Structures are given as C-alpha cells and as structure tokens.
Swiss-Prot record:
Residues 607-827, 854-961 form a coiled coil. Gene3D superfamilies: 3.10.50.40. The keyword Coiled coil applies. Its EC number is 5.2.1.8. Inhibited by both FK506 and rapamycin. Residues 178-269 form the PPIase FKBP-type domain. Residues 335-432, 1435-1449, 1465-1504 have a biased composition (Low complexity). Belongs to the FKBP-type PPIase family. Signal peptide: none annotated. It catalyses: [protein]-peptidylproline (omega=180) = [protein]-peptidylproline (omega=0). This is FK506-binding protein 5.
Amino acid sequence: MNFSEEEEYSNRNAASSQKLGSLFKDNNAMSGNQSLQYTNNKTQSSANSNSPDVLISFPIHLYKFDNNKNEYVSSGSIATAIVGYKSSGKYQLLAYDNNKNYIVTVNITAQFNYSVTTIYGSFTDGNGQNWSMTFNSAEESTKYATHVAIAKCASGGYQQITFVDINNQSKTKPVANGDRVSIKYAGWLENNQRVGSLFDSNLQSETPFRFVVGEGKVIKGWDLGVIGMRKSAKRILVIPSELAYGKKGHSTIPPNTNLIFDLEVTGSKKKEGSEPSLPSLNGQPSNAPQQSLPTQLFDNSPVPQDDKANLLQRVAKLGRATGFTSPPPSDSENESNSRNSHSNNSHNNNNNNNSNSNNNSNSNSNNNNNNNNQNNNNNNNNQNNNQNNNNNNNYNNNNNNNNGYNNNNNNNGYNNNNNYNNNMNNNNGFNNGMNNGFGNNSMNGMNNGFNNGMNGMNNGMNGGFGMNGNMYTSSQSPQFNPMGTFGSAYNQQQALIGSGALVPIMPQHQQPSIIVASPPPPVQQAPPPTPAPAPPPPTPVIVQAPPAPVQSTTETIQILVEEKQFKKEIKHSIDQFNSKLDQVSSKFDSLAQPIVKGDVPISGVLLVQTLHRLVEDNEKLIKENVEKENRMVTLKENIATLHKKNEQFLEENTKMMESRNEAITDNVAQMRRQIIDLQKQKTLVEDDLADKQMLHTKSQSVINQLKRDYNTLQEELNSAKEENQKSIQDQEALKQAEKDYALKIRAFKKSLLDEKNARKSDIEKINSLEDELKDAQDSLTQAEKSNEESLKRLKLDMVRIKKRNDDKVSQLTLEITTLKDTLETERSALSSVQTLVENTRLETESKFNLLLIKKEEAIAAAELSLSEEQSKYNKLVQSNNQQIDQLQKLIDDAKKKLDHEKEEVIKSYKKGFAEGIESTKQENDLITTLQQQIQQLTTQYDDTKKSLIETKEKLSTLESQPPKTIVKEVIVKVPSDGTTVAVASSNNVDVAKEVKVCMQKVFVQVSESFDEDEEYSTDSIMSTFKDVIKRVTVEYIQEQKEKQQQQQEKEEEEVVEEEEKEEEEKEEEEKEEEEKEEEKEEEKEQEEEEEEKEVVVEEIVTIAEEVKEEEVVVEEPVTVVEEVKEEKPTPAIEEPVVAKSQTVVDPLSTKDDEDDDDDEDDYDDINEEDLKNIDAEIEKMQQEMGDELEDDDDEEEEKEKETAPVVTKSEVVDPLSSTKEESEEEEEEETKVEVPVLEEEKEEEETKVEVPVLEDEQEDKVESDVEEKIVEPPTLDEDDFEKVEVPVLGDDEQDEKVVEEPAPEEEEETKVEVPVLNKDDDEDNEKDVASDSEETPSTPPPIDDVEEEEEKEEKVVEQVKEEINETKFESSPFAVDEPTTTEEKEEEKEEEKVEEEEEKVVEPPTIDDDETTAPVIPSIDNSPRQTTTEEEESSTTAATTSTTTTSSTPVKPDEADTTKKTPKKTSFFDFDDSPFSAETETETKSTAASSDPFADTTSSTPTSTKKKDFFSTDDDSLFGNSSDIFDKPSTTTKKDPFDTDSTDDLFGSIKTNKESTSTASSTSNGGLFDSDSLFGGISVAKSNNNTPSRQKQDFSSLFGSDPTISPLTETEPEEKEIVLPL
C-alpha cells in the first residue's frame, strides 16, 4: 500500500506527541518533561560505524535505459552492493566494475522505488535515469530485493512499513481495506539490517492464512502492508517493531524486533457493499465511498521535507493527549505567525495570511484533522483534534488576549462553545461555532469523514471571514475505521453541509446577525462500538437556515471544485497584497532614516519640497487603498454569497444528521427489544440445559455402574480362563511326566538286560584272565630266578669298580691336602685384604637383605590372595562332588541289587587283573632296565677315568697360577642368601663385568712387570703378584666407594621399579596359574592311564627293593611326595626339618572323568525341583565336613608337636628369619621319619606310592601293552568306590578333593618311604659296598619290632641334635631316614589310618608337613606322572624343586630352587670351617641313612651332590660353614644370588632360572668357570651331564674346569674327603 508523505511524517513522530501531551495529563507516570530529553528517532547505530557496512552484494549485468532510442543498453557485467552508513543512517545502492569504479550510486530512502520481475530489478537514480539489473537467479534477485526493503525501512528510522513488490504485473484488483485475503507467508527476524532466523511460515502447509484486512485481527503492519497487493504477486514487507509486537514480543520473537515477511496473496474476496450509494431519506445508513472524492483537489498540500518542518510539527503537537496522533504541521505556519505579529490592527490582513497558511498546510494523515487557530498576538491557540479515538479534545486556548478576546478551552472531551467575543478583531465567534459544529466528539466516527471531506470548506470560510483557523485535509481515509458503515455515510453528509453559504463580514462594532446565541444543552447519544471506551460526546449544534434542496454527489463535487478555484484566487490576491505591504513598510523604514547624515541643517525649501512629495505620495497611496478597499468589498460580497451557500449546506447537513439520528435511535430501540427477547430465550434455554444436565448426570452414573459391573465380570472371566489354562497345562505336564517315567522304566529294563549280558561276559573274561594269571605267575617265578643270578653278577662287578675308584680317589686326596697346605700359608699374607672383603660383603648383605624384605612382603600378599582364590575353587569342587554324591544316592535305591552284583564282579576282576598284569609287565621291564643300568655304569666308569686325567692336568696349572688373584673375585662375590632372583641376576651381570675389568688390569700389570727373557724367583713372583693385586684392589675399592653413593640414589628408584615389576610378575603368575588349572584338567584325563601304569610300576619298585637289600647298601631314601598344591614361596626362611612319613594317596588312580560323565547323565534325569531340595542337604553336609576337617587339623598338629625336637640354629642369623609359627612348623617336620618299605610289604598293603620315572621307550611299551592286554572294567557308579584322599593342585592349601576309587581299603594305608636308587648310582654302589658298611655302623638291619623302631627314631633325633649343637650346622632332612621298617609296624599304621579315614575326610597335605622323598628306581627315568622340566633333564641338580607333584603340573623355575640359609661367614682361607672339616664331623653321625652334607637335597627327585664352586654359597662359602647341607626342601623362591642353580655365576657360565629348566647338561656344569669370560679362553667344562659330582673346593673360577670332579653320588655321603695336595 502506498502511503502519503504526511502519513509517514505523522507516524514517525507519534512518540514525541505523547511525550509533549503527557504534560497535560492528570495521571502522568512519566517523571519530568520527556520532550526535553533528547532521543534520536532513528535506530541507534553501532559505535564508530563511520566505515560503510556492506549488507549484500551480487554479480549482475547492468542495463541503462536510453530515452532517445526508448530501449535498454547493456553496460556490461559488473557487481552491485547495498552499503549502509550506521553513523548517519544513510544507505546507498552501488554498481561498480572490477576496478571499483562506481557506475551507479543511488541513495536509498523510504520513497525509493525498486521493482522486481523474476531475475530483473529496475530503479531510477537521483538524475531520473532508469536502470535495470539482471541477476544470475531468481533467488539472488529476491534476496537483493529483501535487503533493499530493509534499507528503505532503516533509512526512515523504522517508523513506517516498507515493501518491494515482486512480479506485481497481475491485472486483478488490488487488495483494499475490508477485503478477505488468503496469504502464504514466511517471516524472519531482522538482525542488524540483515535477514535473521525464520520464526514462522506456512509455505509447507496446504491451507493458506485467511483474515480480513483492517479488522485488527493481525498485527497493524499486516493490515497496512497487504493493501495494494494483487493475486499471485509477492511482496517483501519490512515491519517496524512498533507496528508489530512492540516491547512485549511474542513467543519466539524478542521485544522491539523488526520483522521481515515474504507475502504472496493466493486469493482475495472484496468487501460486501463497497460500491458508492446515496444517503437514504428514511434515515438508514448508507456508504459514501471515499474514492469518489477527486484526489486532484489536494495535490498541492504541503509536505514537510526538512528539519524545520519537523520542529514545527513537534511545537504544533504541544499539549496533545498521548493517546492521539498529532496532525501534520504546515510549512507556512511560521510565516503566518511572523506576519501576524506585524499587523495587529489589520484584521483582514491577518485573516488573509491565515487563509494563505491554511492553503499551504493541507496534509494527508492517518489521523483526524486538527484546527490550529493562532492569534495575532500568538497567545490564542485554538487547536481542534479530531482523531480515530473516541476522545476528541478541541483546545481553543486564547491566552494573553490584549484585545479582550475570550478563552475557548475544550479540555475534557466536550466543546465549550463561545460564539460571541467582546471584540471581533479575530472573529473567534464563528470559528468557535464551526469547531463546535464540525469537530464535536459526539460523532467520532463521523468526524473522520466530515473533516476529510470538508477541510477545503473550512479553509475557505476562515479565509473569507479573516478567521485564524487552520484546517488540514486528508486525501485518504484512515486505514482502520472502527465505525464501519457509519463513517462513510457521514462523510457525504458533512461534505454537503460544508458547501453552504458563507456569512458576510460584519463591521467591528457589529455582531454577525446569522450566528445564533449559545447552543442548547447537548443531547446524549449512544456511543458507537470502539476498541476503547470513551465518554458520550454532546450532539452538534446546527445553525438554523432555510431548507435547501438535497443535492447529489456530483453537484457537491462541482461545488468543491469551484470553491478550490476561488480559494486559489483569494490566495493569489492576498499574496499580492502582502508584497505591496512589504514595499510600503520598507519605504517607511527608509524614510525614517535621515537623508543627510550628520548635524548639517536643512533648508526649509527642501523640507517643503519633501513634504509636498510625501503628501502626493500619500494621496496616491490613499487612492490605491480606496481602490483596494473597493476590491475588498467586492471580495467580501463574494464571500457573503459563498457564506449563504455554506448555510444552505449546513441546513442540509442538519436535516441529514437529524434523519440519521432518528434512524440510529430507532435501530437502538429495536436492538434493545431484540436483546430483551434474546435474554428471555436465553433463560428458557438455560432451564432446558439444567434439566438436560441433570438427566446427563443420572445417565452417567448409570453408565459408570454398568462399567464397574462389566469390569468385575471381565476379571472373573479372565481368572476363570487362567485357571482353565493352568489345569490344561497341569494335565499336559502330567502326561509328559507319565511318558518320561515310561521311558525311564524302559531304559532301566534295557540297562538291566545289558548288565546281565555284561555280567555273563565279565564272568567269561574273568575265567580267561585267571588262566592267564596262572601262566604269568609261572613265567614270573622263572624270571625272578634269572633275575637274581644277573643281579649277583652285577653286584660283583660294581664292587670291583668301586675299589678301583677308591684307590684313585685316595691318591687325589693326598694331592688336595698338599694344595690346601700351600693355600693356608698364603692366607696369613692376605689378612688386610680379608678385612676389605669382609666389609664389602657386609655392605652388600645389608642391601640385599633390605631388598629381600620388600620382596618377601609382596610375595606374602600375593600368596594370601592366591590361597583365598584356591580355597574358593576347592570349595566349589568339593561342593560339586558332594552334589554328585547326593544325586547318585537318589538312583542307588533302584540299583542296589545290580550294584551288589557289580561289586563282586569288579573285585574279583581287579584282583586277577592286577596280579596278571604285574607279573607279565614288570618281568620284561626289569630285564631291560637292568641292562641299561649296566651300560650306564660302564659309561660312568669311563667318565671317571677321564675326569681323573683332567684333574692331574689342572693340578699342574694350579701351581703356575698365582692363588691370590682369587681375592678379587671374593671381594665382589659376597654371599647373600636373602636376595631375590631378579636382583641377584642383575647384580651378577654387573659384578661379572667388574671382575673382568679387574682381572684384565691384574693381567696387564703382571704382564708388564715380567719380561719373557728374564728369570724370576718364586718369592719375587709372589711379591709382584701381591703388589699388583693390592694396587688393583685399592683402586677398585675407591671406585666402588664413589659408585656406592650413586648406587644408593639409584637403588631407591630401582626398588620402586622392582615393585612395579613384581606387580607385573604377579599378573603373569596369575596367568600361569590359570594355565596350570587348565593343565590340571588335562592331567585328570590322564589319571586313568596313569592308574593302570602304576600297577605295573609297583612291581618294578618291589624288585628294586630286593636288589638294594641284597647289596646291603645303605642308600639315602627319598620320601614319596604327595601331590602338593603349588603356592607362592613363603617369605620366611624355613628351618631344617626331618621329613615325616605321610600317607600317599595316588591321584592317578581315580576315574573322575568317567564318573563325572555318568553323573551328568544321571543329573539330566533329575528335575530342577529335586535339585533345589538336594542343595539344602548339601549345605548342611558341607558345614559338618568343615567342622570335621578343623578337628582333624588340630589333632594332627598336636601329634606333630609331641614328637618335635628343638634344633639350634646357625650362629649367623638370617635378617629375614622365620616367625615363631613357621619355626614351630619346621620343628614339627624334623620329627618326620622316612621309612623305606620292602617289596613284600608293598604287595600286601598295596600302598600307593609315587610312580618312578620310566624311559620314553619303556613308557611306550607299557602303554601299548596295557592297551592290548588290559580290558577296562565296566564303568561303575561312584557309590561302588571307596572315598580316598586326592589332593587337588592349586596355588594355596585347600581341602582334599574327595573322589571315589575302585580300590579296596588296603589302598588307603599310610604312605611308605621307598629308598631310591639313582639311575647313576649303581656304579657307585658297587664301589661303596665296603665303605658304606664301615661308615654307617649305626644303621640297623630290618627288624619286625615296632617298639624298637620307634626307639631308634628317638635316638636318631637325639644324635641329630647333638651333631647340630656341636658343629652348629643345620640337620639334613635325610638324617633320620630308616630303611628298616617291618610289616608289623606298617600293618598297625594301616589299620589306624583306615579307621581315621572312615570317620573323617583327611585334610590336604601342606607343603611343610607332606614333603617326602619320592621313590625312584635306578634304571628308570620316566614314569606315568609328569615331572618338572628340571627333574626330567637333570637328576644331579642340587637345587631342584621340592614340590614335584604327580599331577604333571610344571613347577616354575623360581619355585624349583631350594632356599639357602645364610651360611656362617668366616675368613677367606679358613679351611678349618670349610666343607672339608664339616664333612669329617658329619661322618660321625649315627643316622639311619647318612646324608651327603654337600648335597642341596630336594624332596621329589633323586638328588646328587653338585660341583662346588669356589665362590658358591650353595654348600660352603668362602666365608663360613655350610648352611645348606641340612636345608629342608621348600617351595620358597628365595635364592642365593650366587647360587649356581638359580642364578648366573660371576663369570656368566652358570645358567639362570630359565636356563636351569632347558637342558640337562647345564645343571651338572653349574659350577664350572668359563675361562672365556676373563681372558677369552675356551671353557673346559665336563661333558658327562648325568654323572653326579661331589662338592669340593672349586678352583674353576680362576683356572678353568673343575679338577676335582668326583663320580660319587648322593648315596655315598660317608666317603672321606678328597684332599688334593697343593
């Protein structure tokens, strides 16, 4: 919709009028005069925005319109942009080329015309040149047009709506006020002169938005902005916030936000009755269209264009109420006021000036016209405000009236009509009458139309009568008219009234005869419907005049045209008159000045002449004035005629108004009657509604009751259905159960038939096996005879070889004694060095002990966690076994008869089967093993010869080497038993390097001190050696002191790192434990096969026993080790104990796998309900079992304490000594006696012992024979078996797993210790027959009396105590081994054990209590059980694992080494405390089986003495006695860092823990010195890996391989020491 400039101007300043008008309001909320506070009407720009802001830019193709050719001419492809200057509020449209040369620059104002057609945009610059732009797409064109509309609105200060039409070429009618339109729209928020976020849109919906234009149902900006649009055309509409949602905002629209809309009219419907119609005579309202008035009449109305007009407008609105919109001021208002000030006495001139100002101040506005009447004195301001609101206040303020004018004030919404003034200088009487008649508040809606139609008439009257009235006309009606149809009818009537006759001008002393006196009191009219309430205004006063005929609309228009022309003529004449008056006034001014300046006198003639001229001029002026007065008279006559016409119009208007009022009153009365009727109908309808509601509530209650009844019935129906379904399911379950029971009965019948058939077949097999048994027994007797003969021959050969070796050994001992004497002489010379060695040793010991304490604490914590996990695992296993037992019992009732028959068949089958297999298998195996023994003895004999030859060679080298070079190694190699493996290995690497460096220095200095050509004496050589060694040692000690400070700082960091490593090792150990558990499961599968092999091996063991008894050789027995649970080493150093004989329960004899399979089948047949009942019973049984196990533990501990002797410890106490509890446990273990059992006892008692190791070939033969000959008995239920003890492997001590074994009660007897023959010992045994009998006179022959045997054990223990007290050595675990147990003693123990096992479940064996030596047959290397890799590879290692089990679980290398006690520290060459002197003392022991004092014994493998390294602390260190010879076998990982079996030697030749399990050869050469480590030589280690060596003084660390290797085994501990002469 196109707005006039006046409307834009008035809208823009509405806020200022409210501020000024607020001064005159009673309830003013504002503080002070808000008009005095300056606020810019334009939007505040951002600070320092002098630089232009580019709103948008696009590439275009520009065209310029050529008026001559009447076509567009292309200007090329350039770019366009819209630029805004925020500081000035100025916006420009720019078109520029690539060089930024501006081609077009246009200022964008609110009136800027920009049209868009698809991709074309057209505009006109300030020079009137038309331009057209082509965009690349319609989207770019639309965006550009949107920003043009924003810039237009922003340039006008966001005071009015602006728009840009797009494709507005439709020929349909434009939308007008009152039309119903359908619109598709999209709305965005305006953000800093740019398009912001989308807040609403209906483009996606199918139905458009419909509303009636002008009803106020939408925001005011839409009511105004939609007008003028055509169907199918689009419009970009920018609405200021004042015309949108204002300060309140709306949902997603913030307050004071300008809106941007893209509107498209999809349809419109014209308002009904919009066509023009004449006013009806019967008083009915009719519509007079405003469009019928020609707009050409008002084209010359002034428009404010500058800041001066702005200021005048604000002044004109002074005193207006804030609720009204101020009228636009005229540009000539200031002129009229200034001219009136110069002519106070000339009323006509003043009126002419006012009329001229009125003609120049006609404006078009949205608001009603206002009359501003200003006095000549500028004191009387008659302001008439006619607005859209109901309250029209006509303020006629005539203040400071020097001429006696009255004050006409209309402040309260009513017109106080002052028709007569005392003096008519200003003719205010008629003006007031006109104000009252035409500007009354009673017809607010009519005033709009009247003022719009009659502004021209008012201006004419004011000009004719000299009135100071300023009437402003509007070319258009306001956009929103709340009166609806009433306003249009009054417009025509008011227009007709305005064309009446004019009142002629009267003299000053007269009064107008036509103007009547004061009007009668007003008549109250019903107010029209308005948006806001207002007091009812008075009715207008009508001037009485003769009636005039009703004129048509065309005549009215003609009269208005004539009036306009007349006003133009009057205006022209008044302008001429004013110009002449100006000339006259200027002349008077010039005449007032003196002609001649100064005090020069003027002559009278000149004065007279001038006076004559002045008189003539005055006369001329008087004549001209008279002429002008005459003209004025004629003009007044014309005005009178016009006034008469005006009166006619007024009369007509009054008639129309009366008829109109009557019609309105009739309508109102009729409406009142209709309202009364409607109210009566309403009461009737309400009564009916109340009755209907009562019925509704009653029916609703009935419906609710029926619903409740329905719900109850529905619930009952559902419950009945559920019961029915349950009964059906129960029936189906019962049917299924019947079918299952029938199937089970059939299965039982089938199984019964199968068992009968199997019984028959078993009987047949038993008969056949009995026959085979007889044959096997016959063959066995023959084999035994032949065997005895071959054994006698072997014994004779062994005795011969032994004697030969003894002779050679005696010679070597003499040589060793000589060497010893020479070494003793040198010891005194090294006393100073000895002190240094002792100091360094103590320092390193303290460091190692500190590290050991931390390590042991971590190990103890890990041990506890592992024990808890293992106990949980064992409990689960035990509970599972108990559940299986309970489930098995449920089936026993149905199988009792069948089981009884099975037991008889199985027992008979077992006896025959065992006897037959043992007789056949063992006979062949023993022959082969004896042959292998002979071969081994011959090879060993050859090796001993070679070793003797090598020792002689090494003795010669001994004499040439300086012995004092040993000191350097001694300084570094300090024994420390308490260190952990990880620390020891790292220190050994460093020590080895340092020793190499030191030895190289010694070698270099010695080589430099001697010349090859010269000869030296022994004294000089020794002195030079001493000097060199002293220098090197002193230098080394100084370097070490410097390094110690650095190392101490590093050690703290290393401790932290070691703790982290320990945690990682724990995790690895946990993983290994998981792997071990998996291996345990695999071992259980192999138990059945091992059980069968065990039967074969037992016979072999008995035969080996007979061989030993016939040889009358006292052998060191190795007790059978029960299957011991692997656990982490305890941190305490364990005391030496004597192993106690324990009951050996073979874990390989069970058939858990088969039984478990059977149990699973049985378990499937049982329902879950039965299992729940059984679980409760199992829990009770577990509690009872736990109580019994605790009681058994207490009983066993008490028994052990009763027999525990007190053992004194070594003088040198280990810093990590064991606690009291551990010492007590160790003391209890000392009383354990190893009892070797003869063959007859084993056969009768069928005691389960650990299976000896068989060779691979023999094992394959045994397995193949068993598979061929042995027929497995039928699978039996677990109730058929006796419950025996089977220890379960784990990391912690746990309860024994109770399993069932098909074995008689005799198999549950006490464990027997079987003396072991090392497979390398046969050759030595033959040599030692005589010597052993002499050296062990305390060993009694086998006797049958149990009491004597017990007394013997006590004596042995006492002897051990005495020996420990004398020599301060720790007793050997084999010191009280007695191979002379009898059958009577074993039978008594068996009976006691059986009785105890029947009453309770025996506790699992602990590591400390259950460690026993394993029986190993000399000629057999492999057995069905799986041993550790260290056991399989070397039978001669002194520090092998003490916990080798029969479960095939590999023991970790760390756990495999035996913990060494801290040896007693002595001087370097103190040979009195050396192992040689200790050996002579231990020879006097009267033990049952003398132990090798130099053997690092183990509990699971046949151990032999290993080679003694010169600096090794495994046996006797250089600084003390042997503390390891009596060490108890343990599972702790504590190792001597210099242990030859656990860590590297100083010179890198000894294998580490991992290497100890890799090859068998490395274990025998553990103490050899690698000569390449110091001087690049080649190692001269022995190659006989299997030949056990005797502990000795090791010189290999300096001189190469050991020259004193002894072929003697561990079974020859009583041989005299070989003393080599130095």
